[in-house]
A protein has these predicted regions:
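Active-site-adjacent structural elements in enzyme catalytic cores
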Residues: 2-266
Length: 266
């Protein structure tokens, strides 16, 4: 094979059912970028600014959206994000029910202080200094995020592993050549992803999780409702996705008022 024909191949492994040590080695070393399976498909996972820069380059994506922070435990979530007791109760309910949930929240100052001092803040928050804090996103990636935080206090930042604006259809082959070539490691688990929505096909399955905004237009945390009707601003479901029916039912148990505005990002 001539040198011009040689192509660097990203290492691909099948999920081993536990913490994928190859992923830990790459991410702990810094500047790494991997592709990992979740309940709804595949994500790009990084831990620092260098990794985030690689992600934006691989996805060819605009930088105005709040970053996604993967929380491997409720303790990590509570340490990082500002929440009212009602919001915390919502997370706890979904944690206990093993339901994927992401909410737009402000950072605690003490949480922000733990970010790497490398300028990553500008790439994983929006201009309001909010991020989407996600729990119960699927065992293959949960295990990595939990271990990163508990062993090294490293963050797990995420973005869907597909060309921006396109879905990966829950298949590792759907992540696209650009992302595949850019990643240091691809963890394949098409069987796991398919098992989460066994009654769906490629055309009817959800390719994303539900996202709920818990902040006002300036990024300030919404007020508690305390069973009062009509408190504004209120939670807004801004993206439908996996288990939307269960999540809205749970929200109705905690909040007397919330809005459903799919696509109402900014």
């Amino acid at each position: 094979m001539t040198e011009t024909m040689t192509k660097t191949m990203t290492k691909q492994v099948h999920w081993n059912g536990n913490v994928q040590e190859e992923a830990m080695t790459i991410l702990q070393a810094g500047k790494g970028m991997i592709v990992s399976p979740t309940k709804v498909g595949y994500i790009i996972m990084t831990t620092d600014k260098a990794g985030l820069e690689r992600k934006f380059s691989a996805k060819n994506r605009k930088r105005n959206k709040p970053g996604v922070v993967l929380c491997g435990s409720m303790a990590e979530l509570e340490e990082l994000a500002e929440m009212t007791p009602e919001i915390r109760d919502l997370y706890q309910k979904h944690w206990d029910q093993d339901i994927l949930l992401g909410c737009i929240l402000p950072w605690k100052k003490t949480g922000m202080a733990q970010l790497p001092d490398d300028g990553c803040q500008e790439l994983m928050m929006d201009q309001r200094q909010t991020s989407c804090f996600v729990i119960k996103f699927g065992r293959p990636s949960e295990q990595i995020a939990k271990e990163l935080w508990e062993k090294n206090h490293q963050f797990a930042f995420a973005s869907s592993a597909n060309p921006s604006g396109q879905g990966n259809r829950g298949l590792v082959t759907g992540i696209g050549e650009r992302i595949e070539e850019a990643a240091d490691l691809v963890i394949e688990a098409d069987d796991y992803v398919a098992s989460i929505q066994p009654d769906k096909n490629i055309d009817t399955r959800y390719e994303q999780g539900v996202m709920v905004s818990m902040v006002d237009q300036d990024g300030q945390l919404i007020p508690e409702q305390n069973n009062q009707v009509g408190i504004q601003p209120c939670p807004i479901v801004i993206r439908k996705g996996l288990d939307i029916d269960k999540i809205m039912a749970n929200m109705a148990l905690i909040f007397t008022s919330f809005d459903y505005r799919h696509g109402f990002y900014y």
